[in-house]
Design a protein with these regions (language model features):
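Short acidic/histidine- and often glycine-rich active-site loop of Leloir-type glycosyltransferases
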Residues: 157-167, 171-172
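Nucleotide-activated donor-binding/catalytic signature segment of Leloir-type glycosyltransferases, i.e.
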Residues: 84-113
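Conserved donor-binding/catalytic core segment of Leloir-type glycosyltransferases
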Residues: 30-49, 55-60, 70-73
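Short glycine/serine-rich donor-binding loops of glycosyltransferases
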Residues: 139-142, 160
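Aromatic "clamp/platform" in nucleotide-sugar-dependent glycosyltransferases that forms part
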Residues: 134
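Short alpha-helical donor nucleotide-sugar binding micro-motif in glycosyltransferases
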Residues: 113, 121-126
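Short hydrophobic beta-strand element within catalytic cores of glycosyltransferases
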Residues: 151-154
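A short, active-site helix/loop in glycosyltransferases that binds the activated sugar's phosphate group
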Residues: 1-14, 19-25, 90
Length: 172
């Protein structure tokens, strides 16, 4: 009502998520072609994105599935190159320490920055996509996983409840 008072000719136009082009093209996720017990997390850059939560949960998963691997998009925090170690700060150092503390070096890969095609391939290769964020609006990565048919688990935050139906199109 208030906006209409300011501009009575205002019209609201709904527009679905617009994703990167390659996500609309074949192929789509296939259980027979994915890498068994592989988890993909598309963002590990800040605490709000929750990579640490996945690391903390991984030892529990490893009890049942000891060959589980988690691939994180984002800085290669496990790099042993001196130039990389010197530039790690705050959260990246925390992730590095957490991986070592929980003895997850063989089960965790930080892939660095990925191109659109590399991201798509990670979604296709993963057995499951996990979005552990504490805050989101309308996450494109969740939509990208959905359009490819990748099974997904998401935290319940922000706009995720509008994009995901628990038990049907993914899990909270």
């Amino acid at each position: 009502d208030h906006v209409m008072t300011v501009n009575p000719r205002l019209r609201y136009h709904f527009m679905n998520e617009t994703l990167r082009d390659s996500f609309y093209e074949a192929p789509v996720w296939n259980l027979g072609q994915c890498k068994k017990h592989t988890i993909f997390v598309s963002n590990s850059g800040s605490p709000l994105k929750g990579a640490h939560q996945v690391l903390k949960a991984l030892p529990i998963i490893l009890r049942q599935y000891p060959d589980t691997v988690v691939n994180f998009c984002g800085s290669s925090v496990m790099s042993s190159a001196v130039k990389d170690i010197l530039r790690f700060q705050g959260y990246h150092l925390y992730l590095r320490r957490l991986v070592k503390k929980l003895c997850l070096q063989d089960n965790v890969h930080f892939l660095g920055s990925l191109s659109e095609k590399q991201m798509k391939q990670q979604f296709l290769d993963a057995n499951v996509y996990v979005m552990p964020s504490s805050i989101e609006n309308s996450p494109n990565s969740l939509c990208e996983a959905q359009i490819l048919g990748t099974p997904l688990v998401s935290s319940y935050c922000g706009g995720t409840s509008k994009l995901l139906t628990d038990g049907e199109t993914g899990y909270f």
